[in-house]
């Protein structure tokens, strides 16, 4: 293996071990402007996009001890390395894809040491974020409490109304 390829292989291995997960993409009709915009969007969620040869990427996976079936075909592969939350990176890819006429195709991914198919990665990206889930839980907890407060308020209002009516009758 040539020195340049060895260096690239080592660099990809480091990215695999440093990342919390990664997403494999096929990119269709991706212009330089799309690529730049996509990379900027990913940097907001601590992720980066790399275009790599499939052979080098899967060799790096193998030497890093990560098991994943190589995709069919030759050529290049788009890889999103997520250094933060991999689900946020997947959501960012999905959002970008919606805005740019499905120019990206999910092939596979690895999140929380689990290998996922392209469909599974896309399904994970469609799930609510942790922030949204927390808001839903708080809403579920707060709703019964507000109902109890409303009931207590109406009961107390009824008691006060009865006391007021009784006081008016005794004054007459």
From Swiss-Prot:
The record's section on CDD domains has: Ribosomal_L10
Q: SUPFAM superfamilies, per this entry? A: Ribosomal protein L10-like
Q: Which organism is it from?
A: Chlamydia trachomatis serovar A (strain ATCC VR-571B / DSM 19440 / HAR-13)
The record describes the protein's role as: Forms part of the ribosomal stalk, playing a central role in the interaction of the ribosome with GTP-bound translation factors.
**Which keywords has UniProt assigned to this entry?**
Ribonucleoprotein, Ribosomal protein, RNA-binding, rRNA-binding
> What InterPro entries does the database record attribute to this sequence?
Ribosomal_uL10, Ribosomal_uL10-like_sf, Ribosomal_uL10_bac, Ribosomal_uL10_bac_type, Ribosomal_uL10_CS_bac
Its family remark reads: Belongs to the universal ribosomal protein uL10 family.
One Pfam family per UniProt: Ribosomal_L10
A GO CC annotation given for this chain: large ribosomal subunit
Reply yes or no: does the keyword Transmembrane helix apply: no
> Organism's domain of life?
Bacteria
Name this protein carries in UniProt: Large ribosomal subunit protein uL10
* S-S bridge residues: none
Q: Name one GO biological process term.
A: translation
Q: Name one GO molecular function term.
A: large ribosomal subunit rRNA binding
């Amino acid at each position: 293996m040539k020195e340049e390829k060895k260096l690239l292989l080592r660099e990809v291995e480091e990215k695999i071990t440093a990342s919390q997960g990664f997403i494999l993409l096929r990119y269709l009709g991706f212009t330089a402007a799309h690529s730049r915009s996509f990379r900027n969007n990913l940097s907001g969620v601590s992720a980066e996009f790399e275009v790599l040869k499939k052979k080098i990427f899967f060799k790096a996976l193998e030497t890093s001890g990560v098991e994943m079936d190589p995709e069919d075909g030759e050529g290049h592969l788009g890889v999103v390395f997520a250094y933060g939350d991999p689900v946020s990176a997947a959501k960012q890819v999905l959002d970008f894809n919606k805005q740019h006429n499905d120019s990206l195709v999910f092939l596979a991914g690895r999140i929380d040491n689990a290998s996922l198919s392209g469909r599974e990665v896309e399904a994970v990206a469609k799930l609510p974020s942790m922030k949204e889930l927390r808001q839903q839980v708080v809403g579920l907890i707060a709703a019964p409490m507000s109902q109890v407060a409303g009931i207590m308020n109406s009961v107390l209002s009824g008691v006060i109304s009865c006391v007021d009516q009784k006081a008016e009758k005794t004054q007459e």
